Amino acid sequence: IAAALRLRAKNHNVTLIEKHKDLGGRARVFKKNGFIFDAGPTVITAPHLIKELFDLFNKKSENYINIKPLNTWYRFIFEDGLKFDYSGNEQEMKAQIKKINEDDVAGYENLVNFTKKIFNKGFTELSEVPFNKPFFMMKQFPALLNLKSYKSVYELVSNFIKDEKLRRLLSMHPLLVGGNPFTTTSIYGLILYLEKKWGIHYSMGGTGQIINGMEKLMKEENIEIIKGHEVTNIILNENKITGVRLDNDKEIRADNVICNADPPSVYSKLIESKNLNSFFKW
């Protein structure tokens, strides 16, 4: 959706294809027994990135979606009944940590400072840089090693925090993206600082309201939206992409195709090329 809006803002004719009957991908919602569930993210950590999409068309995001900052971000309840309210209020955070283990207050401060370094490298410097060349990727290894990316998030937190409960709550961030804190690289520790920097926000009515607002914007800007049809093949003609084929055999011609699925799946399943398919067999 973001790519479609950005391309439309540059005056491209854009067609968005979604295999489900509703938009959103990981941010879509589903309904069951009268209830609405977020299929993916529930909280918003960088609302300015959403606002940017509306700014492209000189429109106010608040006319489409209602995003509110939260005071309490998460509430942890441990097996012994201990409660911990996780927030952006550093005084309250340190006071709660002190009650559990006074020595971990300094460790918490050091952890936040370290995750700031990870954030500056992994988000600020590299989030908009394409990792499409081996040499460029290799250049990042020294910095990533210095930031202890070979450790898991839990291992990184444990370097600073002694108490087991505090270790668990401060290493929970990979869970937000479906990861395991005990195996996910410590680079994901940047989420801890990202939350501190921009806060945690909630879309009133659920994440689906953000998608509804973006869909309304796309329709206003004449982006064609095709729902309920899956792309089965990216058409390759003399080593040039010329369009896509849908599950109803309809072909849509295009000068450029953007796909946000993982590259191995795209190249091995959607593009008919023996050279590409053999490369991605691993």
List the model feature ranges, each with a label:
Residues 142-155, 195-216, 226-228:
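Short beta-strand to alpha-helix junction loop
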Residues 10, 156-160, 169-172, 213, ...:
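Generic, well-ordered alpha-helical scaffold segments in large soluble proteins
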Residues 200, 204-212, 220-221, 234, ...:
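Glycine-rich loop(s) and the adjacent beta-strand/alpha-helix scaffold that form part
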Residues 79-184:
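Rossmann-like flavin
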Residues 224-242:
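A conserved short coil-to-beta-strand element within the FAD-binding core of flavoproteins
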Residues 1-117:
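N-terminal glycine-rich phosphate/pyrophosphate-binding loop and immediately adjacent elements
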Residues 184-195:
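Residues forming anionic-ligand binding surfaces in small-molecule and nucleic-acid pockets
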